[in-house]
Amino acid sequence: EDIDVILVHGAGSFGHLKAKQYRLAEGHVEGATFDGPLTQDEAVTDVRNDMLALNEHVLNALTRLDISAVSLAPHQWARNTGPSFEGDLSLFRDAPKGIVVVTHGDVVDCDEPKRFGILSGDDLVVRLATELPGVNRLVFAMGGVEGVLSQPPGVSSEAYLIERLTENMFFEGEHAVEM
């Protein structure tokens, strides 16, 4: 079967730690001081570069498996954050057949006064899965974790660990980026 694949990977320690340290999810914080040598603007550049480095590792891993791939870093084509971010999703639709398109959560430019923010891979996935034609599967692959929580930690005492997801399983929750 001829299947087109879009791979959306997370940031892990390449992006999350510095983004949290410099409060990048909040956007520009006037007059804020940080426990580190960088300004917020310098941290934006650093996190973008760190994400490009991680993305290069992903592309190299695919290449070693003889999988052709191309990268679309969100800071190069998307603006604003959340599920209503602005960006040309046709870049994914129009990618050459047989090429895996790789993207990731990223620090993107935002309207004033925020100036920048975190566009999460979760928001990218929602838009790609619902707006691109012919999408019939969304697969989450995770490593090094015990499973998926039914709700974010601390939101509800009724949250439970889902050790194995199946196609007949349904749960509902809300996710927010806390960086």
Locations of regions flagged by a protein language model:
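Internal active-site segments that recognize and position negatively charged phosphoryl groups
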Residues: 56-58, 83-150
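Polyanion-binding loop/helix "lid" in catalytic or ligand-binding cores
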Residues: 38-59, 105-127, 157-179
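N-terminal glycine-/serine-/threonine-rich phosphate-binding loop
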Residues: 1-6
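Ligand-binding beta-strand-loop-alpha-helix segment within the catalytic cores
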Residues: 20-108
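A glycine- and small-aliphatic-rich helix-loop capping segment at beta-alpha/alpha-beta transitions
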Residues: 14, 20-32, 117-123, 155-162
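Glycine-rich beta-strand-to-loop/alpha-helix junction loops that act as flexible
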Residues: 8-12
